Structures are given as structure tokens and as C-alpha cells.
Amino acid sequence: HLLEAAEEDLEIVGGEVRVVGAPQLAVTLGELARVLKGAPGYGFPQGMDPGLEASATFRVDQLAYSNACHVVEVEVDIETGGVRILRYIALQDAGRRVNPLIVEGQVHGGIAHGVGNALLEWMGYDAGGQPVTTTFADYLLPTATDLPNFETLYKESPSPHNPLGVKGVGEVGVIPAAAAVISAIEDALSPFAVRISQMPVMPHELVELIAKGPTG
């Protein structure tokens, strides 16, 4: 309509819709979107409403699973039960990274969440079943001072099950983190045969577990 040409005589090249064989007769995709939105001064053929809208359904028959390996080094004060994370290394395979910066942010946030699950985020209830950790004064979250600099590595093995070769990235940050931290604590306290069966593990609980150990 804008170029006064039939649909079959149009092509999209370099961000423009243009008439085949007459590249000077063209309109940019941005201008086309502005017009279709209903820009003043443009009329539409009868039966055509302003708007730029399309819908489609994409179905994935097979899921794309992510993989990760997290390694943590911790220091535990056996007198206070305090835990300090000295080093955190995370190797991720989230398929093709379309936007590496967003992937890095997702992984960092996931690790922080997992550390919180392992050490801080306790949800408590009173005898009547009412929550007692209802503010951030009671429900503790990790801050920057609780976390080390994360060392992140990436192996891109594109998924064969979708056109972009992508996999989920949120899960590979958060799910291994808590297990890696707890495993590191158990390893650090191996002389005391400490086994941790619930999260988060609080300092006073670690002191009690150490005291129950063979060398406690």
C-alpha cells in the first residue's frame, strides 16, 4: 500500500521493505512499524485496521537440560560455627549463550540464592503455625559481604532440540549452589564426622554437630 506494489513484488533487504528491481522505492522496517501503529497522515485500505501484531505457536517436543559443576572452598570456625566462603568456581553448560552478560547475571544471582538457602534463609513458624520470619530483619538474605568473587566458566554445547541451541540458565546457578556449600562444610569438618541433613545450617547447629563428633 505504501509503495503501491503487489506483495509478490516486495522483498526485505537490509532492514528495508523495497520493490524488487527498484531499490530506491523502499521503506524502513522502523517507519513501517510506525505507520502500522496508526501514525497521523496515513490512511489504510478498507478492512485494514492499524496495528502491528502477529501470533505463532512453537512447540518443543524434547526439553533441553542444562548441566553445571560447582566447587566451593569454605572456612569454618569450630568454636562459633561461622562459615566463610573463600572461593567459588562454577562451570556452566547452558547451551548457546545468546546474551553472555545476562547469562552471567543469572548465574551470579542463582549462586547467591543457593548460598542463602544453605546458610541463611530460614523460614520459622510459631506453635500456632504463624510465620515468625516476616521481615528482612528476621529472614536473612546474603549480601555482597557474605559472598566471594565468583569464578565462572562456560562450555557451550548447543542443544539440538531448539532452533537457537539454548538451554535454561537460571537452574544451573541456583540448584548446585546449596549442595556445593553444604558439601564443602562437611568436608571441612570431616575430622568431626559432621553430616548435615537440613538447610539452612545455622552456626549454633554446626557447633552442636561438632560437639557430637568423635573428636568434639
Regions found by a protein language model. Give the residues of each.
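C-terminal catalytic domains of large/alpha subunits in multi-subunit enzymes
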Residues: H1-G216
